[in-house]
Structure formats: C-alpha cells, structure tokens
Amino acid sequence: MELISLFKQYLTVERQYSEKTVTAYLEDIDAFQKFLTDTGDKTDLLLVDRFDVNVYMSYLFDRHLARTSISRKVSALRSFYRFLVKNDLVDKNPFELVQLKKQSDKLPHFFYEKEMNMLFEAVYQAEGAQKLRNIAILEVLYGTGMRVSECAALQWSDIDFSMQTILVLGKGNKERYVPFGRYAKEALQNYRKNEWEPFLSKYKQTHNFVFINHYAKPITTTGIEYILNQVITASSLNGKIHPHMLRHSFATALLNNGADLRTVQELLGHSSLSTTQIYTHVTKEKLQESYRKYFPRSTDA
C-alpha cells in the first residue's frame, strides 16, 4: 500500500528510526488494519474514527496484553495518524486522545555479582569456534552498559584502545562516549587477533563491524540475543532472564558503588534523568546492610 510505504520512508529518512523500530511500527499498523477487516466492512485507514479506536482498545484489553504492548501499539498508530494529518490526508488523529492509565514503574531486574560470575564462568569455560567473540560480547555489554542493538552496530573505528573508550551510536543517532575496563580490552584484542581477522580472511569479508556471525558477516541484534541466551542457559541460572538485564546490572553496580545519577545517565545514553531514576533502587543486600547499620532495633536480642 502506497500510504504505508510513505510512512515507512518518513520513519526511516526523517525520523531516522532503526530498522527494528520501523518494522515494529508497520506490524502494529498491519495488525490494526487486519482487525478492521475482520470485525467490519471498514478497510480504509483514512476513514477510521474514534468509535473504531474505542472498539480496538477494548479488543486489546480483552486479550490481556501487557500494558507495555498496548502502549507500544497505540504509540505506533498515533504516530501514523499524526503523519497523515501532517500531510493533509486526514483531518483528525483518532488516536490523539487515547490515554492509558499510568502504570507504576517496575524495578528493573538485574544480576547480582554472584550471578554475573556464573555467566562469565560459563562463557569462559565454553567451547566453540567463536568462543572469543562470545566472551568479548559479554565483557563489552556488562562493562559498558550499552544496548544489544548498539553492540551489534559497533565498528572497530569506534573503539579507542589507548583511551579505553567507545563511541556509541545510540537511539535517535545520538552519540556518546563510554569507557571500558581491562577485561573488555583484553577480550576485544584477543578476539580481534585470533578470531575476527582469521574469519574475515577465510570468508573474504572486508567490513569493519566488530561482532560477526559464523560467515564473518555483521551479527544482528537477534544473533547477539541468541548467544547471550545460550550463555545464560549454560550458567544454570533460573528464573525469567533477559539479555537486557546486563544493562540493568551495569547501572545498578555503578550506583551501588557510589556513582552519581548524572554519570549513569550519560553512560546509558538516557535523554531524560527521570528514565535513569528507576535505577536508584538498591540490592536487597545493600538494603539489609543499611538497615542493620542504621536502625537501632534491627539486631537480634
């Protein structure tokens, strides 16, 4: 559909959204159009009104979707109709007035130090043709707090080994510098010399991307998530675990060891300090330690 193609071009060129974000937006619009087709005779997105939106919202809530999923769908459709209004294709945005009740922010899940040690033990003891790559990925993600998507886009020219800093291209093409430590430095240099260069030579690749798949082509975000899930499985950690927890763990470790909120905001690449404030929680151990230390009736008789 020409309308969707124009919106895709707008998201990609003007908004400079990532391919993953653009795909998610288009999928949400497609799902809405399918809903309209399945539930009535209205198939033209230009004719949608508030009644259609209300019916769709009821449908989403009836499916017991997570509030974050519903919010994402509404955001995509609101952006789509703003684009249509901007280009005089519709008069009003039917999603403009949709408001979801604010949900209290959930504390981010993170790995405790003991759990991180289990992850590193698992990846260092593993076998495989690209073991060094996997080690470097874990060291870089935990050592810098960068997003998985940022890690996938990393190029060697972004890394300054002498200053031990990485130039990260974040959301909205915003650049930031993040430092990295000795473990990440050694892992990257070892990987480059003993895996990356031989792989590129073997498969006759000439790009500059740091992390590669088994054909020496730039790895995808999905590829990194798969590797991390394999490491998590090998570590025998239980519970609901997601690779993004490495980023949460990085922020938590900094704050628990005395870093100020502004510094953590800069390192994570958050545009707003309020986004970073969710990390001001402390670990249970820290909470108990402070309680025992400062509350007069905390000790046993």
UniProtKB/Swiss-Prot annotation:
Residues 106-292 form the Tyr recombinase domain. The gene is xerC. Its main location: cytoplasm. One of its GO terms (biological process) is DNA transposition. This is Tyrosine recombinase XerC. InterPro entries: CB, DNA_brk_join_enz, Integrase-like_cat_sf, Integrase_catalytic, Integrase_recombinase_N, Integrase_SAM-like_N, Recomb_XerC, Tyrosine_recombinase_XerC/XerD. It is found in: Cytoplasm. It comes from Pediococcus pentosaceus (strain ATCC 25745 / CCUG 21536 / LMG 10740 / 183-1w). Keywords: Cell cycle, Cell division, Chromosome partition, Cytoplasm, DNA integration, DNA recombination, DNA-binding. PANTHER family: PHAGE INTEGRASE-RELATED, TYROSINE RECOMBINASE XERC. It holds the Pfam family Phage_int_SAM_1.
